[in-house]
Amino acid sequence: MHLIDYLLLLLVGLLALSHGQLHVEHDGESCSNSSHQQILETGEGSPSLKIAPANADFAFRFYYLIASETPGKNIFFSPLSISAAYAMLSLGACSHSRSQILEGLGFNLTELSESDVHRGFQHLLHTLNLPGHGLETRVGSALFLSHNLKFLAKFLNDTMTFYEAKLFHTNFYDTVGTIQLINDHVKKETRGKIVDLVSELKKDVLMVLVNYIYFKALWEKPFISSRTTPKDFYVDENTTVRVPMMLQDQEHHWYLHDRYLPCSVLRMDYKGDTTVFFILPNQGKMGEIEEVLTPEMLMRWNNLLQKRNFYKKLELHFPKFSISGSYVLDQILPRLGFTDLFSKRADLSGITKQQKLEASKSFHKATLDVDEAGTEAAAATSFAIKFFSAQTNRHILRFNRPFLVVIFSTSTQSVLFLGKVVDPTKQ
């Protein structure tokens, strides 16, 4: 049967009242300089390609920080989900808060205008949400707004225009009803994969921002479930776990052993225009490879793996598993340049003039599942690599130790997901 892959990402940010500092309501304009325009261009000049370098830079900066603080742990997140959510939030930020958000996301505002950023995301989300054969990607946002508060029309219109956000008004004093409203929407949009995302809310919350990515794709070259058998996976020198290992031995794949770096790289394609890179460091060299893991290095590997001499027949051993990642963004992002957003210095007056808002809590959850049965699966794997050519001239790749994974949209040049699989038996 075909291997079906699901990747689901949720990011939730909560904006709550700061203590005191209430403003009298009056009509006003958002601080954003964006202007409404439908952007449908494609090719090298498309708006989404203008923001791709900054998005990639943010992805790897976020990864470095997480990896340095959680050595020996699985990592999995969607940089695109985080970037889109906070770029959308910047529509309601003013003065220093707006520039801190956009610069924290990696955008050089002397080279790229704010309008370019938002039109870039508009084009990116539109492109990813287009239907495709064998590939379904759904990227969406929702704003849950207090029914007692008057929000600026420009902020609401811009979030819908550029980020395809859906708006819901709710009574946050009815915490049970609001939690159910949020969770029901998330459950519906993720096809039931994410349930009970929000477990509690404080009564002083005025707005909840939700961003999600749902990804479902078929491998170009699927596995056969009857060939899956239990095998060892070597977490480290002292830890070995058993995992169901899939097998494929009649197909050609794109892979290389880097002559300058201690790692091997495998590229596997989904139907559609999405690709996944699996990067396997040599034994004990994970830290060395993480240090050179940059957007430029990813492009170098991608360019090399276009050459025919790297297309070879493989005996491929590939584990099936489930992992997830949960991150408290209000603790992480201040170290990436978002210095004021989660403090009383935050200026979110482009959202409403009625109350002073501050971002209180923000978290991100990502899940990745892999199996070959054609039910629910996802894109992540780990492997070790060996070469045997003396008798059969066949290369053997055994995915049996920690590796890195990058899931990449070719048409938008965007890193959709980034992670590290250290122990595939850990959720």
Swiss-Prot record:
Keyword terms, alphabetized: Glycoprotein, Protease inhibitor, Secreted, Serine protease inhibitor, Signal
Self-association and partners: Monomer and some homodimers.
SMART domains: SERPIN
One GO cellular component term: extracellular space
Record function comment: Inhibits human amidolytic and kininogenase activities of tissue kallikrein.
One MF annotation (Gene Ontology) recorded for this entry: serine-type endopeptidase inhibitor activity
Listed CDD domains: serpinA4_KST (cd19552)
Positions of the record's site feature: Reactive bond: F388, S389
Protein name (record): Kallistatin
The organism's taxonomic lineage, starting at the top: Eukaryota, Metazoa, Chordata, Craniata, Vertebrata
Organism name: Pongo abelii
Coiled coil among keywords: no
Location in or out of the cell: Secreted
Family recorded in the similarity comment: Belongs to the serpin family.
Glycosylation sites: N33, N108, N157, N238
PANTHER family linked to this entry: KALLISTATIN, SERINE PROTEASE INHIBITOR, SERPIN
Signal peptide region: 1-20
PROSITE patterns per UniProt: SERPIN
